[in-house]
C-alpha cells in the first residue's frame, strides 16, 4: 500500500530550503577568495579557475585530498565550527607544497545528518580563511545532507586542493645527500592527526575539557586541541625563491618515523638529537596522561614539528633567515647520514 507524503523529501530528512540558505550564507566567505583567480559563480556545476602559466616551461598540476578526521569530534563537543575548515585546507595544501607546488584552488565536501545553515556557514568560513592563508581560490564544494547516515548534529569534512609547479622545479628527494641538514618548522599543536588516541587519553566525552590546565599555560585542553593546523604555504614558497630546497616532509599521521623517510632516497636516514626537538607541552601531557612510550609518541604525533625541510649545510643560515622573515621560528633539527633506519632519534 502506497503512502502519501507532503513535502516528501523534507519529511524524509532532507531540507532543500535549508540547503539554499546555507549557500546564501556562505557566499560572503567564499567572496574573500575570489581575488586568487576564481572566475565562477557560487552554485554552478563546475568551478572555474584562471590558470597563469607565464614564465613556466612545462607547467605541472599537483593535486591533494584529505580530511580533518576525528578532530571533528572536538568541534562537536565544544560546538565550535569556524576553524575546522582551516584544518581541512591545511592538510591538503601542506601536502602539495612538499613537491614545490603553489596552491591554486580548493574544493570542500561536507556531509551531515541535518543541514544547519548557520553551522555550515561557519564551517565554510573556516575553509575560506584557510584558502586566504594559502592564497587559494575556493572554486566549489558540496554539502550533502544524509539523514539516517550521520547523526543530526554531526558532519564530516574533506577537501581537495590543486596546485601548479614548473616541471624543472619539482622537488626530488633523490637530490638529498649525506651531510645535508633538516630544518624544522614548528607546529601549532596536534594539528589533525592522532585524535582517536587523544580523545581516549583525555576521555573527552566525559571530562571537562573547557577548564584551564596549568601544564598548558592556563589554556584548556579543548582550546589547545582545537587549535587549527598551521598552513605553511607562504613561508615555504618564499623559501623556494631564495634557497635550493632539496626535499620537504609534512609531518602528519605516523609522525617522524613515517613521514620524514618519505622525503629521503634509499640508503639515507635522518639523525635527530632528542634534546634539539622543541616538543610542545600538549604532547608531554598526552604522554603523561596516557602513559604512552616516547617512540609511540613520535610514531603518532608531530611532536611540535609540522614540517621538515632538507637543505645543504651551506644554506642553513639563509634558510632560517628567510623562514624567520616569513613568520616561522625555524631551527636545525638534524642531519642526513647513510642509513637504512629511516629516522634515528638519539
Show where each model-derived region lies.
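A short, polar/proline- and glycine-enriched secondary-structure boundary/capping micro-motif
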Residues: 72-74, 195-196, 331
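Glycine-rich beta-alpha junction loops
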Residues: 67, 163-165, 187-191, 199-202, ...
